[in-house]
């Protein structure tokens, strides 16, 4: 019996309208009623997640910013990591050969120097929004992560530049095909979930996790049971071939799996609907 379930959000729980489907909500409530601790592990900001969970009537532990912050159900901080100040300064001052927009995340919000209203569509439920700023107006300390947003091919080329200039000083991952993240070295959802598990007197073997992108890899590979979404990035499926693939997000595949696990855990699971 797993005692904690960790869920990615975008591409795992959130539908195309950026809301959790009603069948999935019902399954999550059933899971909580069965005594399983709910944890939401996402690249989204705490303020964003607070709004989403409030709208959905859910409560649980939060791993946000791809592991840069861990909070309890009341929002009390349990663990955090920030980018080194000198690395933040380097990223902001370097004229990267790219058209990607740059986004910086701190406890007090999401900051960018480029106004792109289309990016707010994914945050309509919570009302979370970016704050336009000049980079030299922000402190160099207290910064969780950078996101670069552009086409995938452009980000692949940018990633090569970043790795060449900052090898060993930060970690890089694609949280979506059009979003490249720069994280503190050694920071990911897997490490954050391990910290949370220890806080709850659990081990990662006591946990199950669901995800669809490369920012879920460490979490999925280290828990007792990792479940890969049917719509997951091909690279994730290739790098974790040993893990079960379940249904797609838009089919509420998480709910389908949870209903099976809660009612017939002794039977072989099939993602077919």
UniProtKB/Swiss-Prot annotation:
Its EC number is 3.6.1.-. Mg(2+) binds at residues 8, 10, 212. Pfam families: Hydrolase_3 (PF08282). GO terms for molecular function: 4-amino-5-hydroxymethyl-2-methylpyrimidine diphosphatase activity; magnesium ion binding; phosphatase activity. Its cofactor is Mg(2+). Keywords: Hydrolase, Magnesium, Metal-binding. It catalyses: 4-amino-2-methyl-5-(diphosphooxymethyl)pyrimidine + H2O = 4-amino-2-methyl-5-(phosphooxymethyl)pyrimidine + phosphate + H(+). The keyword Metal-binding applies. InterPro entries: Cof (IPR000150), HAD-like_sf (IPR036412), HAD-SF_hydro_IIB (IPR006379), HAD_sf (IPR023214), HMP-PP_phosphatase (IPR023938). Catalyzes the hydrolysis of 4-amino-2-methyl-5-hydroxymethylpyrimidine pyrophosphate (HMP-PP) to 4-amino-2-methyl-5-hydroxymethylpyrimidine phosphate (HMP-P). PANTHER family: HMP-PP PHOSPHATASE, PTHR47267. This is HMP-PP phosphatase. It comes from Yersinia pseudotuberculosis serotype O:1b (strain IP 31758).
């Amino acid at each position: 019996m797993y005692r904690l379930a960790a869920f990615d959000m975008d591409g795992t729980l959130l539908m195309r309208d950026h809301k959790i489907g009603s069948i999935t909500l019902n399954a999550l409530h059933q899971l909580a009623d069965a005594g399983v601790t709910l944890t939401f592990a996402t690249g989204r900001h705490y303020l964003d997640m607070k709004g989403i969970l409030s709208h959905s009537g859910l409560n649980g532990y939060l791993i946000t910013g791809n592991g840069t912050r861990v909070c309890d159900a009341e929002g009390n901080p349990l663990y955090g990591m920030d980018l080194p100040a000198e690395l933040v300064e380097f990223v902001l001052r370097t004229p990267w050969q790219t058209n990607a927009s740059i986004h910086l995340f701190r406890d007090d919000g999401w900051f960018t120097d480029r106004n792109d209203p289309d990016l707010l569509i994914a945050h309509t439920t919570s009302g979370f929004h970016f704050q336009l700023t000049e980079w030299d107006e922000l402190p160099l300390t207290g910064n969780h992560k950078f996101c670069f947003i552009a086409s995938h091919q452009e980000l692949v080329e940018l990633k090569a530049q970043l790795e060449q200039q900052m090898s060993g000083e930060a970690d890089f991952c694609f949280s979506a095909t059009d979003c490249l993240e720069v994280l503190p070295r050694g920071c990911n959802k897997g490490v954050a979930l391990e910290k949370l598990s220890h806080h709850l007197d659990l081990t990662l073997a006591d946990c199950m996790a669901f995800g669809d992108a490369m920012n879920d890899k460490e979490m999925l590979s280290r828990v007792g049971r990792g479940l890969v979404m049917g719509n997951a990035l091909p690279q994730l499926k290739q790098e974790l071939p040993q893990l079960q693939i379940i249904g797609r997000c838009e089919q509420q595949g998480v709910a389908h799996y949870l209903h099976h696990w809660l009612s017939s855990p002794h039977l072989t699971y099939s993602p077919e609907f």
